[in-house]
């Protein structure tokens, strides 16, 4: 959460580092009533490298920047307005050989209203935009410019009701319009080996209602429980291919293509009930047991390119041929503190059961493919693991050690003869160590160590 601007006096804060600099400005617009905060930072490894005469950076550019803004207006004791915005971009340019740029921009307007001592409300309007660009400049045969984008328009209302000292109820509603522009390629001149092309656009409306309660049953036992009702509908303008075998779409077996007008409903809506439950039981003043169950539904899918060496990832909505990912997760953990909370320890185990998991056919072509559903396979998956943590938060030496053992598998017809196989996200072992030593008021030493199992890999067994 970004801090609020100072409503009493103007001020600034900044820092100049070896690789980046930052600057923050804040102050009142109307004293004690309306404030602002502006912050920005930029790396300059490329500038310093060129100034130092590093040949490998002579024609190359690499940096990122981000800008943040926030403004708070106190209308009265019961009403406040919050405005915030963010913009950031990563840039990598390899001379005249290639370039990559990707960035995010968001803007939020929020109204906070207090109805009384027991209930308050937040109504928010949120805009977000993610864009990715990749290309080869110039007018040679390999020149091209690729771009993709996702825009979201989100409206939501959230309520919190302090019903009594034992119960805190939260409920609300939200609606998001997703606009996907999976890819567009343009060229410079007639020499390029590529042709100008734009993949089909996708739009969808995602809505949800939720209700939850945090209940304290006794000094030792508390729990949270609730439910979320989600609704997802793909809408036009767009086209849908009809295949001879809808369960196994083949781009060589398209019977017809149906066109839909702007905001027309495309296919059936996906409606899901998502229950959540968690509990905490305090064994004594230093230890407790926690457990939870969650059902989650993901309607947006990340399609990662399997052939291009660049991160040409594509986001797509659930649709006629791509069903929502459904996950059921259970977990239980033991937590204990030692020596007056100087040391915190925990051990947790979890299990996930996943349905409608996506993977790709052998040699899948995802780049500039307008029938991408023909490259996908559907199945199920599981994930299980153990997480252990030891944390020291007091004294001159602080830090933590974390270890995770996990196993993530998929079972998809058409891959590995239908037998389970490790997911690309599988990491059997993950060990992290973070430490900090405060020598005095001026000197602090820090050290980090990370070990992780590599990606699952299949090797050829013969030439």
What spans do the regions from the language model cover?
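Repeated loop/turn-to-beta-strand initiation elements of outer-membrane beta-barrel proteins
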Residues: 33-36, 46, 78-81, 115-121, ...
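Outer membrane beta-barrel strand-and-loop segments of large Gram-negative receptors
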Residues: 152-156, 198, 206-208, 317-323, ...
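Gram-negative outer-membrane beta-barrel transporters
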Residues: 350-353, 370-461
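Transmembrane beta-barrel wall of Gram-negative outer-membrane proteins
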Residues: 17-44, 55-91, 99-123, 127, ...
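Signature of Gram-negative outer-membrane beta-barrel scaffolds
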Residues: 172-286, 415
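Extracellular loop and loop/strand-boundary signature of outer-membrane beta-barrel proteins
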Residues: 9-11, 53-57, 92-98, 106-110, ...
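Transmembrane beta-strands of outer-membrane beta-barrel pores
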Residues: 2-4, 16-20, 29-31, 40-46, ...
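Surface-exposed extracellular loop regions of Gram-negative outer-membrane beta-barrel proteins
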Residues: 131-132, 179-191, 233, 238-256, ...
């Amino acid at each position: 959460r970004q801090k609020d601007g100072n409503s009493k006096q103007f001020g600034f804060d900044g820092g100049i580092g070896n690789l980046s600099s930052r600057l923050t400005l804040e102050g009142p617009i109307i004293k004690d009533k309306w404030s602002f905060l502006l912050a920005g930072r930029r790396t300059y490894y490329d500038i310093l490298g060129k100034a130092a005469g590093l040949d490998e950076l002579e024609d190359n550019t690499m940096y990122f920047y981000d800008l943040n803004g926030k403004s708070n207006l106190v209308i009265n004791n019961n009403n406040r307005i919050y405005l915030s915005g963010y913009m950031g971009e990563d840039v990598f340019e390899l001379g005249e050989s290639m370039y990559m740029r990707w960035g995010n921009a968001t803007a939020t307007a929020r109204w906070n209203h207090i109805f009384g001592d027991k209930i308050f409300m937040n109504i928010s309007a949120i805009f977000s935009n993610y864009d990715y660009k990749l290309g080869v400049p110039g007018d040679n045969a390999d020149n091209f410019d690729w771009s993709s984008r996702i825009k979201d328009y989100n409206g939501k209302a959230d309520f919190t009701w302090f019903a009594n000292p034992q119960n805190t109820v939260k409920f609300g509603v939200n609606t998001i319009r997703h606009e996907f522009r999976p890819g567009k390629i343009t060229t410079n001149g007639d020499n390029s080996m590529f042709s100008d092309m734009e993949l089909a656009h996708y739009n969808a409306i995602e809505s949800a209602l939720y209700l939850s309660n945090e209940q304290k049953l006794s000094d030792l036992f508390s729990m949270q429980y609730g439910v979320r009702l989600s609704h997802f509908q793909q809408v036009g303008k767009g086209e849908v291919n009809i295949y001879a075998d809808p369960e196994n779409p083949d781009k060589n077996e398209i019977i017809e293509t149906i066109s839909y007008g702007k905001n027309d409903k495309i296919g059936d809506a996906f409606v899901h009930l998502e229950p959540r439950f968690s509990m905490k039981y305090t064994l004594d003043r230093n230890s407790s047991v926690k457990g939870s169950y969650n059902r989650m539904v993901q309607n947006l899918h990340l399609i990662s390119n399997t052939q291009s060496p660049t991160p040409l990832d594509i986001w797509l909505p659930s649709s006629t041929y791509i069903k929502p990912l459904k996950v059921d997760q259970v977990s239980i953990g033991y937590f204990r503190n030692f020596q007056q909370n100087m040391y915190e320890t925990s051990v947790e185990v979890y299990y996930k059961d996943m349905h409608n998991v996506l993977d790709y056919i052998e040699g899948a072509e995802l780049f500039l493919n307008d029938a991408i559903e023909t490259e996908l396979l559907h199945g199920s998956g599981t994930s299980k693991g153990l997480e252990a943590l030891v944390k020291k938060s007091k004294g001159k030496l602080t830090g933590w050690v974390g270890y995770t053992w996990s196993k993530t598998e998929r079972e998809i017809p058409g891959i590995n003869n239908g037998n389970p196989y490790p997911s690309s996200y599988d990491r059997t072992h993950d060990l992290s160590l973070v430490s900090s030593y405060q020598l005095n008021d001026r000197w602090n030493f820090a050290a980090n160590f990370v070990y992780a199992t590599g990606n699952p890999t299949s090797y050829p067994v013969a030439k």
